[in-house]
Amino acid sequence: MFKYIGDIVKGTGTQLRSLVMVFGHGFRKRDTLQYPEEQVYLPPRYRGRIVLTRDPDGEERCVACNLCAVACPVGCISLQKAETEDGRWYPDFFRINFSRCIFCGLCEEACPTTAIQLTPDFEMAEFKRQDLVYEKEDLLISGPGKNPDYNFYRVAGMAVAGKPKGAAQNEAEPINVKSLLP
């Protein structure tokens, strides 16, 4: 008989404790965000979707050096080099498979021209896996991205057709390294 009374008291105590816990949580701030209306906080260095940028002249920054594809630990980047009449390299095709990408940022670090940049965009959900394979046209943005004044060909010293090195618009004169010696 006393065993049954003890079980009843124990069960009632458990129910009361659960009710107190439920009502206590009802007055606290919620942990869940209503996502589309309330945007998620992203840290300043968040690595999201990859984009290809343009230089200040509006040309593609990518020179198809293939360093990004080599640096990628999962091998989700593929590209093919082509060359213009003036000798400038560009990617004939540039493809990233975002279903395999782990957003590590190694491709951005490996890029000598800052053509590849990671943006804070993370909304890339698709119903088909094939739709997560982005081509160059999908990745190329109209602006220069994080480095608006950088132009690889101005720094690299490639001569512009018809002008000597250092004579093109916004280009610095070449430095004579022998004059810097003591």
Curated annotation (Swiss-Prot):
Source domain of life: Bacteria
Binding note for cofactor: Binds 2 [4Fe-4S] clusters per subunit.
Annotated Pfam families: Fer4_7
Catalyses which reaction(s): a quinone + NADH + 5 H(+)(in) = a quinol + NAD(+) + 4 H(+)(out)
GO cellular component: plasma membrane
Chain sites annotated for binding [4Fe-4S] cluster 1: 62, 65, 68, 111
InterPro entries with a match to the protein in the record: 4Fe4S_Fe-S-bd (IPR017896), 4Fe4S_Fe_S_CS (IPR017900), NADH_quinone_OxRdtase_chainI (IPR010226)
Co-factor(s): [4Fe-4S] cluster
Chief localization: membrane
Keyword Membrane: yes
Membrane topology label: Peripheral membrane protein
Domain 4Fe-4S ferredoxin-type stretches: 52-82, 92-121
Top-level class of the enzyme under EC nomenclature: translocase
GO MF term list: 4 iron, 4 sulfur cluster binding; iron ion binding; NADH:ubiquinone reductase (non-electrogenic) activity; quinone binding
Binding-site positions, [4Fe-4S] cluster 2: 72, 101, 104, 107
Stored SUPFAM superfamilies: 4Fe-4S ferredoxins
The family this protein is said to belong to: Belongs to the complex I 23 kDa subunit family.
HAMAP family per record: NDH1_NuoI (MF_01351)
PANTHER family on file: NADH DEHYDROGENASE [UBIQUINONE] IRON-SULFUR PROTEIN 8, MITOCHONDRIAL, NADH DEHYDROGENASE UBIQUINONE IRON-SULFUR PROTEIN 8, MITOCHONDRIAL
Record's protein name: NADH-quinone oxidoreductase subunit I
Species this protein is from: Pseudomonas fluorescens (strain Pf0-1)
Name of the gene encoding the protein in the UniProt record: nuoI
